[in-house]
Amino acid sequence: MIQVQTILSVADNSGARLVMCIKVLGGSRRRYAKISDIIKIAVKEAIPRAKVKKGEVLKAVIVRTKKNLHRSDGSVLRFDKNACVLLNDSTEQPIGTRIFGPVTRELRTEKFMKIISLAPEVL
């Protein structure tokens, strides 16, 4: 569960290392976001000469959370870190060309098939 002020690591090669959630999108008073939800983020730490700079405000999709993810078949998934993939604000396609670490099957919608295809492992 991600809320405003949550610090997340970035799971792509866009150049950002750490980002902070500044808004959970999808409702006027929505407090929490889970895997496959889109949030608004601010870049807090980035590498030099990267595609994104510190202080930029972008959209991101959550790919991993520390909070347990319960599936209908009874299985439970949990990750060590909260992670997201940065998205282009207008097209909502990933900025990076590589994804690091596993992503979940919950991202398998029309919007995020690009992330699924770039990921090394889908759980």
UniProtKB/Swiss-Prot annotation:
GO MF: large ribosomal subunit rRNA binding; structural constituent of ribosome
Taxonomy, superkingdom: Bacteria
GO process annotations (BP): translation
Keyword tRNA processing applies: no
Keywords: Ribonucleoprotein, Ribosomal protein, RNA-binding, rRNA-binding
GO CC terms of this entry: cytosolic large ribosomal subunit
Keyword Zinc-finger appears in the UniProt entry: no
Function: Binds to 23S rRNA. Forms part of two intersubunit bridges in the 70S ribosome.
Subunit note: Part of the 50S ribosomal subunit. Forms a cluster with proteins L3 and L19. In the 70S ribosome, L14 and L19 interact and together make contacts with the 16S rRNA in bridges B5 and B8.
Family: Belongs to the universal ribosomal protein uL14 family.
Protein name in UniProt: Large ribosomal subunit protein uL14
Record organism: Wigglesworthia glossinidia brevipalpis
Source organism phylogeny: Bacteria, Pseudomonadati, Pseudomonadota, Gammaproteobacteria, Enterobacterales
